[in-house]
């Protein structure tokens, strides 16, 4: 039989607990299913708490701040940045430390984390009295984000997209002529010759260094 993993805080209160693996249903809190290639598909399932609120998980195209009852894909997409760290109103933070594509389901009756292809179960949990304490413990485990440079806090000019060097510079020159402050101008995709060839296309951007020098002089 499986041991049931339970996490408590310093007050003896249960923060998170795996589902029971006993009974006629023969459920497994940690379920490994062999797949082709030698890896496993993995499900890890915990009991849910009706009074719990869940926050975090990065950037998704959805309207909910409280993630309770939400299902999220654990994968990056255009405008979707999956950061598999969730902070609970019960006073803990949970990091799913697994690079595999998967899903998480914060259901009403249980919470399930899924990895489609993995070699092992790996997650990190921390507790704290405040969100700041939990965030600090998370940062100490994963690394602190660098301070954003000052120019990154100003106005960004971005569009989809500038098709050549002269078009980009003409927009920047217009800002300068109108005395409008601008800190960043984004040269978005397809400035390269072919996908995966990350350099300026010389036909449309004949002198990138001169372009950068002029932008810096503004």
Model feature map: region roles:
Residues 1-149, 159-160, 165, 172-177:
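Catalytic and substrate-binding clefts that recognize carbohydrates or anionic sugar/phosphate headgroups
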